[in-house]
Amino acid sequence: MFYCIFHLRCLGTLLFYLCAMKLQLDFPKIDAPKLKETDIIFGLGSCFGNEVSQQLLQAFIPGMCNPFGTIFHPIPMAQQLNRIMENSPFTPQDFETEQGSFFSYFSHTLLRGTSLEAVQKNHNQQLANANTILLKSTKLILTFGTNWGFQLGETGEWVSNCQKQPAALFNREFAGGEENSQHWIKTLQTLFAVNPGIEVIVTVSPVRHIKDGLSENNKSKAALITLVHQLVATFPNQVFYMPSYEVILDVLRDYRFFADDLCHINSLGLQCIMDWLQKEWFSPNMLSYWKAAKKVQNLFDHRVVSSNFLEIEQLERKKNQLVAEFNSRYHRFI
């Protein structure tokens, strides 16, 4: 009897300490102006940043993300932003050709084409749209992916995308801290001159680039985090750090939140990020807007399997009514 009571007390003590133990770090605060439902966003950067921005755009927040495709290195990213601000049109000299295909090292392979005229026109349309939206934007979301990048061997020019060209054409380089900061300080000074009210949210992608090993990946991420903090210190009232990198790698710390390659973030990890943003970054009105937008989005995503005409008509009326109410309340045009 005494033996059983002793062990029950030990078990109770163990459970008490287990319950009292802290097994996860707290989610970090976001020291940045709240996201409002009236904001216009412009996203630029890696695939992780693209996924976050797309979540906002799909919720009918006006804006644009990566008009020239995903981009990972901070210097080509600054070059893209500068060209968008300048609205400097593309000319035929901006494009290369390979086996009847035309492309630019400035943009993603998705913008390639077999007609130089069509490719140039597409680039200039994207450029004009991006310029218009950027100058109206209230939030710029930048996501740096890696500090390893590529320069053209002949000119030393940083490229946004190697366009699957032979490796011999490029030099793979690790950008210096001063080079990164000089590019971005100058770029942001220009941005704040043409759009004084814009707020810049900068984050570092938690996606691992492990081609050269974990040590090189960590070296790269450290350089990017250093750059971000330099920019925040230089523009303390206009540039803000969003610690999504720390959320994935320091708070969650679990491969359940990664894809099968153990490098990219999966849908569960992205959902954790969005839940964190809702709690820490969304204004109260934005949170209400988000819930309403999700209802509308779910209606659009809903696939009708019924063949009953009356049921289909009823669902269509419900959707139209909900969309009309949403548009009227939030001044949208869905």
Short names for language-model regions:
Residues Y3-I5, F16-Y17:
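Short, positively charged and aromatic/hydrophobic N-terminal segments
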Residues G12, Y17-I334:
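Extracellular glycan-modifying ectodomains
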